């Protein structure tokens, strides 16, 4: 099993319990940073400290072209202990109504999920906000001052490597500091 390396609670605790309960090999990958935290030789707490500590590793990684890799493996053929759901063909509202969640909490209207929405938001921010991010990032009244990409990054809907590479192409050093720490 391959999972995201998340050294924060409760995720770290969940992973420890999973490791204790299974004999399945588990690989944790830090996919949220250009330079994974385990490569640092010391702890840092400020974005500029991280930048300084990772300068050489960062420079060798951030401008590399992304190479698409074909996955060459057998399809999983065993029986599942549940009926699979094809999200392309199902009625999402019916499916969601069956979830054990608080249905009184409405969706966030201006933050639709998915990669397409995430990259649309990123493209808009690149055009309207990235160049002035350093100036407007702490001004809550400036709507285009921040990227509002956190949910898309946190839940894996967009690639932090792609975002970092594209921000780097625009010379957005302060945005990269905030993205990567």
Predicted ranges, named:
Residues 2-70, 171:
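Trp/Phe/Arg-rich N-terminal binding region typifying the photolyase-homology
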